[in-house]
Curated annotation (Swiss-Prot):
Gene: lhgO_1
Binding site residues for FAD: 12, 31, 40-41, 45-47, 172, 335-336, 341
Enzyme Commission numbers on file: 1.1.99.-
CDD domains linked: GlpA-like_Fer2_BFD-like
Annotated cofactor note: Binds 1 [2Fe-2S] cluster.
Protein name: Glycerol 3-phosphate dehydrogenase
The entry's keywords: 2Fe-2S, FAD, Flavoprotein, Iron, Iron-sulfur, Metal-binding, Oxidoreductase
A molecular function GO annotation: 2 iron, 2 sulfur cluster binding
Amino acid sequence: MFDVAIIGAGVIGCSIARELSKYNLNVALIEKENDVGNVTTKANSAIIHAGYDAKPGTLKGKLNAKGNLMFDELCRELEVPFKRVGSLVLAFDDDEMKTLGKLYEQGIQNGVPELYILSKEKVLEMDPNISDNIKGALYAKTGGIIGPWEFTIALAENAVENGVNIFLSNEVVDIEKKDFGYRIITNKDTYDTKYVVNCAGLYADKINNMVSNNKMEIIPRRGQYYLLDKTVGNLVKYVIFQCPSKLGKGVLVTPTVHGNLLIGPDAEDLIDKTALNTTSEGLNFIVEVARRSVKTLPLNMAITNFAGLRARTERDDFIIEEAVDAKGFINVAGIESPGLSSAPAISLYVIDILKNIAKKIEKKENFNPYRRAIPKFIELSEDEKNELVKKDKRFGKIICRCESITEGEIVSAIHRNVGARTVDAVKRRVRAGMGRCQGGFCSPRVIEILARELGVEMTEIEKDHEGSYILTGPTKSEVQ
């Protein structure tokens, strides 16, 4: 019997799991995918928003600004890369300058510190590659950039280190109400729990509708992106937005925490919750809009494009509440932007709801907030590199040439407490395959290392999601 079962191991589910691991509770984290953070969390703008865009009084307004200010300490504890580069919202005419004024006032009401409306001259002094056609900008000094999948993996690892039980590749097929709480039935097992926290993202409606007559609908909204090579990662110094619209915060141009340049997204409401394909129309749109923000946009340096889906509801706000007709069942749904930025504050909000329901929740005396990251060989000093290779010679063998990732780093990623089991899971943990050739050189070697370390055949290694097998068998045995 679990005290709390969390359904969904994206950034929200993992953040709540880590927060719950601070208490004397038996916690289950149940995820239908074969890795944490493998849906919405892995494909987004990777921005920690300051909090000026959300309407005051909404959960987004309350939790974004609060969550933003929690990232410095969290990322130090978890050894996750995070940079407060600041953000600029550009205005191109007098009407948009008025919009900046409204955003500024919203930010002040939401408790966002260090907001400034800047002149054109000041903006161009700060970042010369911004378009000369602007009239001014809203500068949010607390805006930041992060690796969302690394953050989520770190949260999961720290949660497991502190006693959380994680069950991957477990898709929930039914939930039954019981006297003790709930029985969660997956495609693999059954889990009894007193309380349920529904963090199922795009499928939070399906999970809610299993137990509640207050039906929910999640609308998938697709956003498409271009990722550019590190050689142009310093094209802009800040996260560059245009004025927001009803469809979202608009197309941005931003450096990434790893030194690339990211542009996007567009916003397209869909029916299909698996439609992660990109379209020529969508990609052309983000390029056209992004070119309005900056003087130059070297699209010839694009190394990949991708799409992500965010979970939208008609409420136009986060849904974080106990279901009216399902006691002890807490929905955390509709967590679209600024969900990543709000994640730490959302976890505290959910804990408060649980405390009101459960009454007695005691804190642990031995909670360990720290998680050691895998050493990044390329970032070490020469002395540190030599010392590491002396301890483990696999750190002296480069597997991914684009990102200078060693065999030692890949092996470490596989044997963590929430370890990599697929090629893309390795990529998300240590960036092997994230570079210019997008895994063209290193993927076969990563497959070989995964198979060796997991004790399976290379044909059993998947690229990412379940069933995405790469190899069918040795070629020599097939040729007659």
